[in-house]
Amino acid sequence: MDVAAAFLERLDRACQTWGEVNPQEFAQLVRDLERVASPLQFEVLAQAFADDHYLKQEYVGRLLARLNPPCSRPLNELLPQLLPGWNLSIEQLPRYLAGVFGRAALLDALDTVDRTGAQGHTKTKTVRYWRRSIDIQQDR
C-alpha cells in the first residue's frame, strides 16, 4: 500500500473510532501526510470533499490549515469538484483557497460557478461568508 492510500485508510479509521477530532490521532495524521510527496498532499486531502462527512472534512480542514500544501490545479477546475460534497461548517477550505489563490481569484471563480448554476447558490454564498469572516479577522 502506498503512503497516500495508507493515509486515507488511517483517516477513515480515525473517523470510525472517534466521535470528534482526537489530538493524538491528528498528530499522527500530520506525520503520515508529511510522508506523502508535497505536490500530492492536496490531491489526497481533496478526496475528503467527495461526500459531506463532517468529521473527515474537519480533520482535513485542520490539515490544510496546518500544512498548507501546494495546489497545482486551477481554481475554476477545483471548485466544481470540491463544493458539492463540502460541509458548510468546514471554514478551513475557504481559508485555504483564499490563501493559495488569493481573495480576488476566489471571488472570480465563485462568480463563474454561480453563472453556471452547477453547485447551487448556498455553497458559493457560504464560501463568500467565510471569506468575509477571514477579512474581518485579519483587519483586527
Placement of each model-derived feature along the sequence:
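Short acidic, glycine/proline-enriched loop segments that cap or flank alpha-helices
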Residues: L82-G85, P94
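Alpha-helical interaction segments
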Residues: F7-L8, Q16, N76, E91, ...
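HEAT/HEAT-like alpha-solenoid repeats
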Residues: G85, V113-Q119
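Structural motif
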Residues: D51-Y54, P84
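Structural detector for internal amphipathic alpha-helices that build alpha-solenoid repeat scaffolds
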Residues: Q16, V21-V36, D51, E58-P69, ...
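Short, surface-exposed, polar/charged, turn-prone segments marking secondary-structure boundaries
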Residues: A109-D111, H121-T124
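Amphipathic alpha-helical scaffolding segments comprising HEAT/armadillo-like alpha-solenoid repeats
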Residues: M1-R13, R35-A48, P69-Q81, R103-D114, ...
